[in-house]
Amino acid sequence: MISVTELRNGTKVEMDGGLWECLDYSHLKMGRGGAKVVTKFRNMETGSIVDRTFNSGEKLQDIYVEGKKMQYLYKDGADFMFMDMDTFEQVILPPSLVGDAAKFMKENTEVEVAMYGEKALTITLPNQVILKIVETDPGVRGDTVSGGTKPAKLETGAVVQVPLFVEQDTNVKVDTRTGQYLSRA
């Protein structure tokens, strides 16, 4: 058990039958009354965000979330197949859990999966990945002064804006957090 006054950003707790991560907290001291803790939590299963106010003496059940290294193997219909790098077990994860990470995952990409017991909660990609451009317009010679960009389709199906000089079949480095082109690889 953890007191609500010990909550910090990133603290993970179990309350109301769900798993929650603390996004924000503030300690408010009232003039005559007791102190209150105003928090913002994100449900780790559904992604919904709620604001909660607690009295300073309340306690919550803290949980331990383990980060496991996994490797993306392939897509099976709608589901994604991953392999645990320690035990070599294969794990099936639904598209609702993978979410936007699928845009930057190609086969053999290593990811970190937050696990609570045997339940997968979230996927964290590496900050940068190297992907191949499969489709883009050819660059126009001499059109480099404007510093313009053009759309390019990557091997995973994602579309990113790249500089005009980048051509098809070029490997590029992409930031997975923002989806922006970083450099040629």
UniProtKB/Swiss-Prot annotation:
Q: Which family does it belong to?
A: Belongs to the elongation factor P family.
Location in the cell: Cytoplasm
Q: Which gene encodes it?
A: efp
Key word Ion transport present in the record? no
Q: Which domain of life is it from?
A: Bacteria
A GO term (biological process) for this protein? Answer: peptide biosynthetic process
Instruction: Identify this protein by name.
Output: Elongation factor P
The principal localisation class reads: cytoplasm
Q: Which NCBIfam families match?
A: efp, PRK00529.1
Q: Which HAMAP family match?
A: EF_P
Cite the InterPro entries for this sequence.
Answer: Elong-fact-P_C (IPR015365), NA-bd_OB-fold (IPR012340), Rib_uL2_dom2 (IPR014722), Transl_elong_fac_P/YeiP (IPR020599), Transl_elong_KOW-like (IPR013185), Transl_elong_P/YeiP_cen (IPR001059), Transl_elong_P/YeiP_CS (IPR013852), Transl_elongation_fac_P (IPR011768)
Please give an example of a GO cellular component term from this record: cytoplasm
Could you tell me which PROSITE patterns the record lists for this protein? EFP (PS01275)
Query: Would I find Cell wall biogenesis/degradation among this entry's keywords?
Result: no
Stated role: Involved in peptide bond synthesis. Stimulates efficient translation and peptide-bond synthesis on native or reconstituted 70S ribosomes in vitro. Probably functions indirectly by altering the affinity of the ribosome for aminoacyl-tRNA, thus increasing their reactivity as acceptors for peptidyl transferase.
